Regions:
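Gly/Pro-biased beta-strand-loop elements
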Residues: 108-219, 240-243, 271-353
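Primarily a LysM-type cell-wall glycan-binding module
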Residues: 42-75
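Intrinsically disordered, low-complexity Ser/Thr-rich linker and spacer segments
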Residues: 45-49, 102-119, 262-263
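N-terminal secretory signal peptides that target proteins for export/translocation
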Residues: 1-17
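Loop/turn positions that initiate beta-strands
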Residues: 64, 94-99, 248-251
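LysM (lysin motif) carbohydrate-binding repeats in extracellular/periplasmic proteins that recognize
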Residues: 62-92, 134-137
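Sec/Tat signal peptide C-region and signal peptidase I cleavage site
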Residues: 34-40
């Protein structure tokens, strides 16, 4: 890999523009009260090669707000919003506080079809089947994933059934766990406010049909690793998604804590806390991250700010950041020589111009 380390280029991404040195670039400031219902956004890709959707924004709190309410309003997991607003009390943020609302995403790798769930991101992407000749569209929602030994399986599966007002039949292993914790469960839990499946459920082929995408009776926990291997959504989100999903829809469950993308000569990095086989977060592997970044760079000549890239990885707040810029290749062929102006000394077109001197710190 041909790369050069340069001085500081830390940036945060803003929907197609980057601003050097900015802590974060925000689009608009919204004052909001009474957050209750989630609102996912339908993004239309201008090109099949588009890799980034959305734009970060900010919100000014009023007295009644909590970060849990605002997370639900802006279709974020509660932990996702808390992580990018350190030092803010999630239950009592107070009035007049300006909060970051992270709403830009690098699309997961792979085909733009069906449902994709990225476990470290705690986020679901749905690509509706486009009309003939129509553009690719994507809707995204926050989700909870499995924890401990209730592992959410990875790989390709599909929806094999759908049910409104589902009855929950706790598996024997789950009933045993609850009994040992002093919270015994009945053999079945009818549909209603106490049903942890919520009002809508979609059954996956994975695990012999034991895994579901479903609602919840505990919205605060959306965005966390709290479920018994299933994928939990906000009640309003699953109600909106449910009628869009036909039986047979492909579902890909992936584990991609690091997403990278080239946009207009800038290498964007989106980092989330890695998760282990049981869905639990752990410290990032810096060496693994460096290899992933090198793979993204390939043979492109770039200027990478490694210190800032590692800082973004360690923070793992999911906010897009520019960590490298495409650089001019000093070995590239010269452009055609323009016509000589009167008085110009003749020049041999085959003579290369002097190579530019390397920036301070090059090669380290």
């Amino acid at each position: 890999v041909n790369r050069t380390v340069v001085g500081k280029i830390p940036t945060r991404y803003r929907g197609g523009r980057c601003r050097a040195g900015a802590a974060i670039a925000l689009a608009g400031v919204v004052t909001f009260a009474g957050a209750r219902s989630a609102h996912a956004t339908l993004y239309t890709l201008k090109s099949p090669t588009d890799v980034v959707v959305g734009q970060d924004k900010s919100v000014v709190t009023v007295y009644e707000d909590t970060l849990y309410d605002l997370a639900r309003k802006f279709s974020l997991g509660s932990e996702e919003l808390i992580r990018v607003n350190p030092g803010i009390d999630p239950w009592l943020p107070g009035a007049g506080k300006t909060l970051v609302v992270p709403d830009s995403h690098i699309l997961p790798p792979g085909p733009h079809e069906g449902i994709v769930v990225n476990l470290p991101e705690h986020r679901l992407y749905y690509y509706p089947k486009p009309k003939r000749g129509g553009p690719i569209q994507v809707i995204t929602y926050p989700v909870s994933i499995g924890k401990m030994d209730w592992r959410t399986p990875l790989g390709l599966t599909h929806v094999i059934g759908k049910q409104k007002n589902p009855v929950w039949y706790p598996p024997e292993s789950v009933r045993k766990e609850h009994a040992e914790a002093g919270d015994p469960l009945p053999p079945s839990v009818p549909s209603g406010p106490d049903n942890p499946l919520g009002l809508f459920a979609m059954r996956l082929a994975a695990g012999n049909g034991t895994y579901l995408i479903h609602g919840t009776n505990n919205p605060i926990a959306v965005g966390l690793a709290v479920t018994h291997g299933c994928i939990r959504m906000y009640p309003d989100d699953v109600a909106a998604l449910f009628p869009l999903i036909p039986v047979g829809t492909p579902v890909r469950l992936i584990n991609e804590p690091i997403k990278v993308a080239w946009v207009d000569g800038e290498l964007l990095l989106e980092a989330h806390p890695p998760v282990d086989a049981q869905g639990q977060s752990f410290e990032p592997d810096i060496d693994q991250f460096a290899e992933r970044l090198r793979a993204a760079v390939g043979e492109t000549t770039v200027a990478i700010h490694w210190d800032y890239a590692r800082e973004v990885l360690e923070k793992a707040d999911g906010v897009l950041a520019t960590v490298a810029l495409e650089a001019d290749d000093p070995n590239a062929p010269l452009p055609a020589t323009p016509p000589a102006s009167p008085g110009d000394a003749p020049r041999d077109p085959g003579t290369a111009a002097p190579a530019p001197s390397a920036p301070s710190g090059a090669g380290r």
